[in-house]
């Protein structure tokens, strides 16, 4: 009985050590992958089209606002036959960003009061 108990403790210790080593390897791989994704995102962010600028050359190139990506909206100006496309923020997303900003400010006040 003592041998079985000792053998069980040895197996649990060996398993926990090996799983900790594997988790460290996975964490390192995830960290390297995350760094490469951040570098790609920074490179891509420099090429975005600002709000109210022409986006007809690439309709998916609009810049991000604080929370959401702007949308390339196309329309025909009054009295014109040519289609005009510009990066714009839809109104519902504008209101959602304002609400999120107010919630952040309110959360900061609560943290200040009780923190």
From Swiss-Prot:
The keyword Signal applies. GO terms for cellular component: extracellular region. Residues 1-20 form the signal peptide. Keywords: Disulfide bond, Knottin, Secreted, Signal, Toxin. GO terms for molecular function: toxin activity. Expressed by the venom gland. The presence of a 'disulfide through disulfide knot' structurally defines this protein as a knottin. Disulfide bonds join 48-63, 55-72, 62-87, 74-85. It is found in: Secreted. The keyword Cytoplasm does not apply. This is U3-lycotoxin-Ls1g. Belongs to the neurotoxin 19 (CSTX) family. 01 subfamily. The lineage of its organism: Eukaryota, Metazoa, Ecdysozoa, Arthropoda, Chelicerata. Residues 21-44 form a propeptide. Coiled coil: none annotated. It comes from Lycosa singoriensis (Wolf spider).
């Amino acid at each position: 009985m003592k041998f079985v108990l000792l053998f069980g403790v040895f197996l649990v210790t060996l398993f926990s050590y090996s799983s900790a080593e594997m988790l460290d390897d996975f964490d390192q791989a995830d960290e390297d992958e995350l760094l490469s994704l951040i570098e790609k995102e920074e490179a891509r962010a420099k090429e975005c089209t600002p709000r109210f600028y022409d986006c007809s050359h690439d309709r998916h190139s609009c810049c991000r606002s604080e929370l959401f990506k702007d949308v390339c909206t196309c329309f025909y100006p009054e009295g014109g036959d040519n289609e005009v496309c510009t990066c714009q923020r839809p109104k519902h997303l504008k209101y959602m960003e304002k609400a999120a900003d107010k919630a952040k400010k309110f959360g900061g006040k609560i943290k200040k009061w009780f923190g």
